[in-house]
């Protein structure tokens, strides 16, 4: 495995590369866990996932489809979208848009525990859950990466702020 990060004034690029140096094939799952600080999770929206299919982890990974509108947060959200599209996080409270571009990824994970779920899993205490959202490139579940001997796979995510 190798991880590489590079940045300039406008962007941050993260790449996670796995190489099968063994003699037998294997599968693995990966996600580039990015937790963005937001002004108020109930006031932000994610665009780029409209009409994408997803599995809802808050409901036993039930298959769903995102309506033709932005993802918003009015309760617990734990979704694995089958989408390679770039995503934009719009946060008017902080006056910014974060652009998330991905490659080597068949999925996008979106997560915020909300209350009371965040308290139950002890991942988010007090009101901290109101001020972050996770939006990340992923290769998991049925989209796990299979590597034959000698093969490599790179999962890359590039973030930029406007």
Predicted regions and their residues:
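Asparagine-centered strand-capping/turn motif at beta-strand->loop junctions
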Residues: 16-22, 161
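Active-site/ligand-binding surface loops and adjacent short beta/alpha elements
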Residues: 25-27, 35-109
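Coil-to-beta-strand transition motifs
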Residues: 7-13, 23
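Beta-strand-rich recognition/accessory modules
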Residues: 78-162
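Short, small-residue-biased leader/transition segments that mark boundaries at the very start
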Residues: 1-6
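A generic structural motif
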Residues: 20-23, 141-143
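A short beta-loop-beta micro-motif enriched in histidine and acidic residues
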Residues: 29-32, 128
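Non-heme Fe(II) oxygenase catalytic core, chiefly the N-lobe of the double-stranded beta-helix
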Residues: 11-15, 30-31
